[in-house]
């Protein structure tokens, strides 16, 4: 959240409004709800996004690009998938379990998905794998796969992980940066819960074992203590 003035602490929550002026051939995405769009008459348009529920500054985002927007829905909540246009035919293959995940997590936690929309956008050259921006998760391009490529890997664990963050990380946020493992551990547990529900305990246990193995192996390549 160093791209705009802010108190950059996870326990400093705020609402936010963002105006994004973009070429008319592009679309934008940010947190919360798209309130309106103004055509500027010069080949640009300005989108007004508003998040009126408090969240941590590091979760504020904006994206602009030549995306296809594939619309979905969970209950009365808009669920949208922003993908490169070549992957529009595969968007619901990639992200189509999202509404079912939202229903499952809402029932499992006894607390409905708390934000006014849920969008997932795919971008290139992102510095990490994915990011759980409030109501607008960002994924690296690796998640875009056609039907044949998805036979090898679906990355559905990433999708469930980032969605579970909408409760643990976004709605409930750790007090300080040193407590970030709390956010991540809950989201990893969300992966397990989804796999157990959707695919059975055997697969969930296997993937949990793989996560545990990778966790221990990190000590070989990082000069930091295991948490």
Q: Model regions: which residues?
A:
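Hydrophobic alpha-helical and helix-loop surface patches within well-folded domains
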Residues: 49, 80-227
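Acidic/His-enriched low-complexity segments
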Residues: 1-116
């Amino acid at each position: 959240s160093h791209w705009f003035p802010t108190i950059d602490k996870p326990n400093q929550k705020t609402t936010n409004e963002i105006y994004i002026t973009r070429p008319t051939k592009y679309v934008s995405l940010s947190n919360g709800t798209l309130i309106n769009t103004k055509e500027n008459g010069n080949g640009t348009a300005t989108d007004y996004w508003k998040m009126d529920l408090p969240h941590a500054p590091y979760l504020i985002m904006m994206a602009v690009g030549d995306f296809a927007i594939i619309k979905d829905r969970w209950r009365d909540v808009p669920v949208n998938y922003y993908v490169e246009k070549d992957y529009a035919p595969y968007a619901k293959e990639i992200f189509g379990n999202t509404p079912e995940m939202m229903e499952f997590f809402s029932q499992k936690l006894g607390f409905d998905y708390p934000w006014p929309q849920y969008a997932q956008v795919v971008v290139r050259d992102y510095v990490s794998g994915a990011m759980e921006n409030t109501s607008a998760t960002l994924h690296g391009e690796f998640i875009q796969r056609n039907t044949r490529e998805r036979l090898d890997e679906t990355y559905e664990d990433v999708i469930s992980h980032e969605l579970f963050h909408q409760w643990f990380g976004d709605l409930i946020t750790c007090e300080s940066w040193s407590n970030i493992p709390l956010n991540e551990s809950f989201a990893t547990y969300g992966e397990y819960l989804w796999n157990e529900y959707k695919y059975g305990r055997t697969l969930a246990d296997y993937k949990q074992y793989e996560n545990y193995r990778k966790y221990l192996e990190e000590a070989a390549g990082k000069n930091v203590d295991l948490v």
